[in-house]
Amino acid sequence: MVPSSPRALFLLLLILACPEPRASQNCLSKQQLLSAIRQLQQLLKGQETRFAEGIRHMKSRLAALQNSVGRVGPDALPVSCPALNTPADGRKFGSKYLVDHEVHFTCNPGFRLVGPSSVVCLPNGTWTGEQPHCRGISECSSQPCQNGGTCVEGVNQYRCICPPGRTGNRCQHQAQTAAPEGSVAGDSAFSRAPRCAQVERAQHCSCEAGFHLSGAAGDSVCQDVNECELYGQEGRPRLCMHACVNTPGSYRCTCPGGYRTLADGKSCEDVDECVGLQPVCPQGTTCINTGGSFQCVSPECPEGSGNVSYVKTSPFQCERNPCPMDSRPCRHLPKTISFHYLSLPSNLKTPITLFRMATASAPGRAGPNSLRFGIVGGNSRGHFVMQRSDRQTGDLILVQNLEGPQTLEVDVDMSEYLDRSFQANHVSKVTIFVSPYDF
């Protein structure tokens, strides 16, 4: 058994490597001596790694202590910030107002937040932002109803009253109110002779299913029932998920391009173009399935600037190269940048969590004891809020309806702190493809 103590192993090597001549028969062989040396080298390497890790941790602690001491003035600083109110028509998350504690805000459906969604208590006793408030959303302000439809406001929703000949939740579809294109008046397919019988000197007539009796007695005719028009009226259930086409005595449902009709003949299902046998995207790009279509993406890392550069470690992630020891600005840039793509239907019910950001510590290493989440970029910040769901997780929440087709981008940030000292931050760039349909 080889001693585990480095000192004991070293003494053993000295004794056994150079014995007295008369005891040479008890010496270690060359192979045994080399094996013992290798074990000692491995042991020293492990000790060196643990020592370096301890030094790094001690430096971090000393830097945090230096920062906290430097902030202390001659007078005692406040240990808490003023109380914050819950916004009218909104909610507040967080009841502690001590230094470095966070408070988050969100609004009820039908309202949007004006002001910061999160604030942090600073050591000087002030918050990082003003008290936010909730403002009512006018769902009709974007004029969502098409083709002369009238918009009616609702709570976090709207309703379109369509003019004759139009249908759909935004009056975007043309209702089939007459015979198909190419037919002529009196087409026998849409008007048929009734079946009549003489009963007790009176004539009784009836029509096949899907037709109704029209006209005066003795001159009646069976006219087609336009189910698409009948069930397209306000308050009646929809016959079709997408578009309804009237047919003689019945109807059929159609789906838009990029969708297939399911076995029930009414529902539509998106076709995933990205799983076909033949690739649809050029080499070097990745196919992202969207509602009724697809996108070919190839995200790129930020260009290098000065002593800051990034390397692509996977198709959807970039990592920052190590920073020079004296470069403080470099360390405050994102350590990792990841890319994410989501496909959503129009008019998705809100609020709903779309994306989740979290951290986990490597085994044997001290992880961050404080995380801060926020929205740091994008083209539609007002549609989203970033809210902490637990100590290690932040949720990106959609709080306003999205009307397609459109593409939204939002950048979310997670910053790590150890004993109030900044360690690193990570950015996730989320791209959202909104389809023109609500299915």
UniProtKB/Swiss-Prot annotation:
State the signal peptide span.
Answer: 1-24
Q: Would you tell me the Gene Ontology cellular component terms?
A: extracellular matrix; extracellular space; focal adhesion
Indicate the segments annotated as coiled coil, or none if absent: 28-53
Which residue range or ranges hold the Sushi domain?
79-136
Sites carrying sugar chains: 124, 307
Source organism superkingdom: Eukaryota
Q: Which GO terms describe its biological process?
A: cell adhesion
**SMART domains on file:** CCP, EGF, EGF_CA
Which GO molecular function annotation, any one, does this entry have?
heparan sulfate proteoglycan binding
The family annotation for this protein states: Belongs to the fibulin family.
Q: What is this protein called?
A: Fibulin-7
